[in-house]
Curated annotation (Swiss-Prot):
The gene is rps18. It comes from Rhodomonas salina (Cryptomonas salina). Belongs to the bacterial ribosomal protein bS18 family. GO terms for biological process: translation. The lineage of its organism: Eukaryota, Cryptophyceae, Pyrenomonadales, Pyrenomonadaceae, Rhodomonas. Disulfide bonds: none annotated. GO terms for molecular function: small ribosomal subunit rRNA binding; structural constituent of ribosome. The keyword Chloroplast applies. This is Small ribosomal subunit protein bS18c.
Amino acid sequence: MAIYRRKASPIKIGDAIDYKDVELLSNFLTEQGKILPKRLTGLTNKQQNKVTKAIKRARMLSLLPFVNREGSL
């Protein structure tokens, strides 16, 4: 039976996830601007929901693009 080690979360528990922190949020987006799933990011359910809401809020305020056609963030 294989034993899998859980990947460490890139965000520490208790750290604030803010929609204005574009540099942090861009780590959870693909080159096309899509939100990465939690199985790839290593976030918990609660953290993934907060990151998703922060990304969507940043998109509405034009801090992040909805679709990235240039291929770079």
